Regions:
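Structural hallmark of WD40 beta-propellers
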Residues: 28, 111-115, 157-161, 196-200, ...
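Loop/turn-rich, solvent-exposed surfaces of beta-rich toroidal or solenoidal domains
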Residues: 318-347
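Conserved blade-ending motifs and adjacent loop-strand segments that build the rim/top face
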Residues: 313-319, 350-372, 409
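Intrinsically disordered, low-complexity acidic/Ser/Thr/Pro-rich linker and tail segments
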Residues: 2-9, 13-21, 25-151, 158, ...
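Canonical WD40 repeat/beta-propeller blade segments in eukaryotic WD-repeat proteins
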Residues: 101-106, 145-153, 186-193, 229-237, ...
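Blade-level signature of beta-propeller repeat domains, shared across WD40, Kelch, NHL, RCC1
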Residues: 370-410
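Per-blade loop-tip surfaces of WD-repeat and WD-like beta-propellers in eukaryotic adaptors/scaffolds
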Residues: 126-136, 168-181, 207-229, 238-244, ...
Length: 410
């Protein structure tokens, strides 16, 4: 009796995965449409592997202090397409909250909400999975525009801590909707942060204060715990419970602008990362810090060796005003001019992956004062509006600057 011939579709799953692994992405897309079994095998074993470690869109485990911000949960194949859009500058641009008076806002991004300061008022806008992706009318607000400008704000859990230009600040409980005004400094508050009951604030020319947060009759009261004489432009508590404070000075003639402060003792250590000014910094993990500097560089600093581990320079010699980290490999840098944003890959030292800036001619000299991103959207604060670049737009015109970047690096 003649044996039945084995069909290709009858092969076991491991054999199919091995064969499919030799195909390019276009061929995989065609095969995934052949039958449901091929679609499942390719999605689970191939698309998931190809999309795991992609820049900005990868689904690998992220740092614990960098939770997912995606308003839409994309499948593995869609993540690959989104990465290609980031890589080749393919996006649709929208403008929100335009204002004639020059001032800059701060933003914080979550899965469901965008928090944005408008002078002295904090507005909370709902994000949706619909085409608009952002509701212009705020769902709720904190404070009033006529109050002193909000210079910096931080949200952890359901608590917001913010500092104002007149030296005051506030702690706001989002769950109970309770506002507690605080007096933090005698001059402009440049940055704040908190971790649990520990609150930190720093002024433009005064000092850095460590506070203990107490709740009395439902209101927050900050009790001064420690004061350090130095003032800083940017501060951030370490993600290991806030045992250390990374701090960057606005100006230091000795090029020792980056410091590490022991929270318990107030002892300051100078990190060997030569820079006259650090405008913004973030903790990558409990041992490494990302810094945006006046000297046109973004640096990765290891606190264990107190040395720079890697340095990325801007191709056009612009200072780095602000940073956003995706929790894995991607770092976005907001630059000093033309509301330009650079994308860097921590796995590729020196190399700028892509640049994003608007071709529109209005207010095109503004720095990027604050930025935030998820897998499909980039929020950019200029001095006259909020720009949103939506990368979930496959048919948008590509604005690819990699040719110029390759020429600069090589």
């Amino acid at each position: 009796m003649a044996k039945e011939s084995l069909q290709f579709t009858d092969l076991d799953e491991d054999s199919l995965v091995h064969i499919f692994s030799f195909l390019n992405l276009e061929d995989l897309d065609r095969l995934a449409r052949v039958c449901h079994r091929f679609y499942i095998v390719i999605t689970v074993h191939l698309y998931s592997r190809l999309s795991a470690r992609l820049l900005q869109t990868g689904h690998q485990p992220k740092a614990a202090h960098c939770p997912s911000r995606n308003v839409i949960e994309f499948d593995f194949r869609r993540r690959i397409s989104l990465f290609e859009n980031w890589r080749y500058g393919r996006y649709a641009e929208n403008q929100f909250f335009q204002h004639r008076m020059l001032y800059f806002s701060q933003i914080m991004l979550e899965k469901r909400w965008l928090y944005m300061s408008h002078r002295g008022q904090l507005r909370v806008h709902k994000r949706t999975a619909e085409r608009g992706l952002l509701r212009v009318k705020p769902s709720w607000t904190v404070g009033a525009e006529r109050q002193s400008d909000i210079n910096w704000m931080v949200k952890k859990g359901e608590v917001i801590f913010a500092g104002r230009a007149d030296g005051s600040g506030f702690v706001y409980d989002c769950r109970k909707r309770r506002y507690s005004k605080q007096v933090l400094a005698d001059d402009i508050v440049t940055a704040v942060d908190f971790e649990g009951e520990l609150f930190v604030s720093t002024g433009k020319s005064s000092s850095t204060c460590f506070w203990t947060g107490l709740v009395e009759d439902g209101q927050y009261a900050l009790e001064r715990k420690l004061e350090v004489a130095d003032a800083y432009q940017t501060i951030k508590l370490s993600p290991d419970g806030g045992s250390r404070l990374a701090a960057g000075k606005y100006h230091d003639r000795a090029k020792s602008a980056l410091r590490l402060i022991d929270v318990e003792r107030g002892f300051s250590t100078v990190l060997n990362s030569p820079s006259r000014a650090v405008y913004h910094l973030l903790w990558k993990d409990s041992c490494t810090i990302l810094t945006g500097n006046f000297d046109t560089t973004m640096r990765l600093v290891d606190t264990r060796t107190a040395q720079d581990e890697a340095i990325w320079s801007d191709p056009y010699d612009a200072s780095v005003y602000c940073l956003d980290y995706d929790g894995a490999y991607g770092v976005l840098c907001g630059m000093k001019q033309h509301f330009r944003v650079n994308l860097y890959d921590l796995r590729a030292p020196r190399r700028c992956v892509q640049m994003y800036f608007s071709p529109r001619k209005t207010t095109n000299y503004s720095p990027v004062y604050s930025l935030a991103a998820d897998s499909s959207q980039l929020f950019i604060v200029t001095d006259h509006d909020l720009r949103v670049l939506n990368f979930d737009a496959d048919h948008a015109e590509s604005k690819d600057f990699t040719h110029d970047l390759d020429r600069w690096f090589y």
